[in-house]
Amino acid sequence: MIKIKLKLESQIFEIIMSTASLKRDHALIEKVLKSMWSTIPLLKSGKTIPEPILNQVIDFSMNFTDVCHHGKEENSLFPELEKKGMPRNSGPIAVMLMEHEVTRKIATRMETSSKTYLKNGDATQLIVDMQEYINHVVQHLWKENNRLFEMAEMALRNDVEQVNKSLQDVEDTKLKELGKTREDYERFADEFTKQYPPQD
């Protein structure tokens, strides 16, 4: 009985850990999204979002969320799931890849509209792009947390150590290429949240 219990507890622990790195990314991304949402009423009322802050929001969206986090999924998690028989061109992986591409396109538009805003003070398109970006990413993260990751945790429960190492290797490589550290983005998220607290 004890051995079975310990074995089950070990399996449960492994299941939790197989996507822990990605869930940690999600928590950081959601933290930034909430403060991004808090800037929208300010922009609508004509208040100014300082250029350094807005530039960091764009950097986080395009580099941490896309290059780093999506990179971990596309170069590590998804290939591992393919090895377990989950197809790349249909089903959950195909949907996530499509949504990643949508995220990139909206982020690129948001970068362009942020430059327009910083140049002439017109926040009209920036507000539209930020709202679309936040709504899209929030829904995407929910699907991953509550659908894809549950399947991944079951499929990869016997390969946790390998998956964790692969995810960490991709994160380290992507951040090094960006000339950033995870701590840089965590620090930004903390500072951004203090300046623009999430709305209730």
List PLM regions with ranges.
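Small-residue-biased structural context
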Residues: 2-200
